[in-house]
A protein has these predicted regions:
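Aromatic-lined, polymer-binding surfaces characteristic
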Residues: 3-232
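A short, hydrophobic/aromatic-rich structural module that often spans a beta strand
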Residues: 88-95, 234-254, 357-369
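Extended, regular secondary-structure scaffolds
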Residues: 180-184, 191-289, 293-294, 301
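Catalytic and substrate-binding regions of extracellular carbohydrate-active enzymes
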Residues: 258-407
Length: 407
């Protein structure tokens, strides 16, 4: 792979297998160019490889950077321009800073300048993280602190977006986003908590306590034998998604607090034992209804079940940027039952999306309906659940797409 990166790069600094004119809003191909730059930079500083301090690799990096700085690729989706690309290239810029020419460094700072303070929830955290990397390139200690304070300002509960009082996570309105934005939130906070540990910018115990409680009272419930529940994946239904997202959460939980918080370590140990330990029975047993997300989890020693609903308060699921284009019915009472954890692994290409488990829908050969905007799509408030911690009941009145039902 690395040989290909080096040998195939054109004189202009472009790779022949990347479509630089790509207009997709998701999976934007030019970002691969940025990812390869970061990969090469990491390799350049890796003593474990023959490419350590390689002049050939360094030359390739400079040429690839020059192409990006010269052509200035722009995606139709703002996320890549302000978050995705600066997040990837920012890491490369910082690692490669000593090798950057003054012209390259100026261009690098310009790329990072695409990120501005603003937004909410995880988008706000991503943007502030990118600004912090720009501040490091500029040796601006005050801006680093401002960015850090902006990041930790989201470690609270009860906002419209972010960590909710029921320990679910919302983004794009009142919409459960455990496996998408919420996972990025935990991953990012874990990273920053380690970076700042032992410094004047370190997270305090209250902040670490909120994040570890999100894992303890939120994420532990939606994972079963190293897989994340299908209904928590959001619109990201890609290959092996339940496995990859569970692993990402496990790594983030393990590193939260830089190994200095007893509470974080305890929560991480429980999560790891439940999902990756050799245990005959699941120790986390009970019934939990995430009342702000219309989402129910029931756990027994040998199995787990989930129910995902929507109401006039809660958005069921989103379809956007080409993702989840068949997910119209995914929150109409979808019910998944797990025993070994692999029951629904990679089933997505084979599913009849009108016959998801627990869903009531009209049978039709017409294309699946697509709704582009994130808004509540079940015209009733009678949706919810009750629980005593061990047992519970969930109920849903369906009134959408011509169907009325009580579930």
């Amino acid at each position: 792979k690395i040989v290909f990166y080096i040998s195939s790069l054109s004189d202009r600094g472009a790779w022949p297998d990347i479509n630089y004119e790509d207009k997709k809003r998701s999976g934007w191909e030019p970002k691969i160019h940025a990812e390869r730059i970061l990969e090469l930079v990491k390799l350049y500083y890796s003593r474990q490889t023959s490419y350590f301090r390689s002049e050939e690799v360094k030359k390739t990096i400079h040429k690839a950077l020059d192409y990006w700085f010269t052509t200035k690729p722009v995606c139709l989706n703002w996320w890549y321009n302000q978050i995705g690309v600066p997040k990837t290239l920012g890491t490369a810029f910082i690692l490669f800073e000593q090798e950057l020419t003054s012209k390259e460094k100026k261009a690098a700072i310009s790329v990072m300048g695409n990120a501005k303070f603003g937004m909410t929830g995880q988008n706000k955290v991503w943007l502030a993280g990118n600004i912090m990397m720009r501040a490091l390139l500029q040796n601006d200690a005050e801006l680093v602190k401002i960015a850090r304070d902006t990041i930790v300002s989201e470690i609270v509960t009860g906002k419209i977006e972010g960590i909710k009082d029921d320990w679910s996570f919302h983004q794009h309105g009142a919409q459960q986003q455990f496996g998408n934005y919420g996972l990025s939130f935990v991953s990012g906070m874990s990273f920053f908590s380690g970076v700042f540990a032992g410094t004047s910018l370190a997270f305090d115990e209250r902040q670490l306590g909120i994040i570890s409680t999100l894992i303890d009272k939120g994420y532990r419930w939606i994972m079963w034998k190293g897989k994340m529940d299908v209904s928590s994946l959001g619109r990201q239904l890609f290959h092996h998604a339940p496995i990859h997202k569970a692993l990402s959460l496990a790594f983030s939980a393990s590193e939260l607090g830089g190994g200095e918080s007893k509470q974080c370590i305890s929560v991480a140990c429980n999560l790891l034992k439940e999902n990756y330990g050799v245990m005959k029975q699941n120790p986390l047993v009970g019934h939990k209804h995430f009342w702000q997300s219309d989402y129910t989890i029931h756990r027994r020693p040998q199995w787990m079940a989930s129910v995902k609903m929507a109401s006039d308060r809660v958005v069921g699921v989103e379809m956007m940027n080409g993702d989840n284009m068949k997910g119209f019915y995914m929150a109409d009472g979808a019910t998944y039952i797990y025993q070994d954890g692999d029951e629904y692994l990679d089933i997505f290409p084979l599913w009849d999306w009108r016959k998801l488990p627990g869903v009531t829908a009209f049978q039709s050969d017409d294309p699946m309906p697509i709704i582009q905007k994130c808004h509540p799509r079940n015209a009733t408030s009678f949706v919810g659940g009750v629980s005593n911690g061990m047992y519970g009941i969930s109920a849903m009145e369906v009134n959408r797409a011509g169907i009325k039902a009580c579930k």
